[in-house]
């Protein structure tokens, strides 16, 4: 039975072209793939770590391990060494890599889910709403089975504002705001945040705004979960359990 449930991790696979000359891209644009060895047609979650697009590293959340699906943990370039939209483009290229390669590992192309926490949630959301990023790498954002961003910003990310020298805390809604790119026809979208009284400032409300805007334009594929009792960091574990359950039930 042990062999049946064996999982393997392949680390530090480059998801950029072999002809890439940018040394920072060569260094950061790598992913780990954790997958069931003796299973075919499994689902895959692409996971973007948090850290404000200024820090953090790829990891496989423990609640997503040994669940019968693969997890692809992605590193992407960080600010201030790289500037917007570098990290969004990296996220898009990583998802496109999964579409091109997951079948080699035994995974299903039509069961690729995109998720992440905090900055990773923002990256998931901007890919879901603005199709141009994945299109640049030959992938269709709407071919993703579902997006499940955890505690992501739906306005323009605070690190992008910081790069522009703008004051903290005052929202900007421009082309880098997922809410500004809201569309009627998208892949299913499961928004998850911590408790509105414990979360980062306006984080729940931003997600509630995106849900309301999507519904107002006729999008029928959006759901919002507020995980009561959990703050911005603590929500990761329970959110991952919700994500694992969603992926396993997905038809």
Locate predicted features.
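Primarily recognizes the serine-hydrolase "nucleophile elbow" in alpha/beta-hydrolase
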Residues: 13, 99-163, 174, 178
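C-terminal catalytic histidine-bearing segment of alpha/beta-hydrolase fold enzymes
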Residues: 208, 215-251
């Amino acid at each position: 039975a042990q062999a049946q449930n064996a999982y393997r991790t392949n680390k530090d696979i480059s998801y950029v072209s072999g002809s890439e000359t940018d040394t920072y891209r060569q260094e950061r644009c790598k992913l780990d793939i954790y997958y069931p060895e003796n299973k075919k047609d499994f689902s895959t979650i692409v996971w973007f770590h948090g850290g404000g697009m200024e820090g953090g590293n790829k990891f496989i959340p423990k609640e997503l391990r040994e669940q019968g699906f693969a997890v692809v943990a992605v590193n992407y370039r960080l600010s201030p060494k790289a500037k917007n939209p570098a990290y969004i483009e990296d996220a898009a290229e990583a998802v496109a890599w999964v579409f091109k390669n997951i079948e080699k590992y035994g995974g299903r192309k039509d069961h690729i889910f995109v998720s992440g926490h905090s900055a990773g949630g923002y990256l998931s959301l901007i890919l879901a709403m603005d199709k141009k990023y994945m299109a640049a790498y030959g992938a269709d954002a709407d071919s993703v089975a579902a997006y499940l961003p955890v505690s992501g910003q739906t306005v323009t990310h605070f690190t992008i504002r910081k790069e522009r020298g703008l004051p903290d805390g005052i929202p900007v809604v421009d082309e880098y705001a997922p809410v500004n790119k809201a569309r009627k026809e998208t892949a299913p979208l499961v928004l998850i945040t911590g408790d509105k009284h414990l979360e980062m400032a306006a984080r729940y409300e931003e997600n509630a705004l995106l849900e309301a805007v999507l519904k107002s334009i006729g999008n029928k594929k959006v759901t919002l979960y507020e995980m009561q009792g959990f703050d911005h960091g603590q929500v990761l574990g329970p959110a991952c359990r919700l994500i694992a359950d969603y992926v396993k039930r997905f038809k």
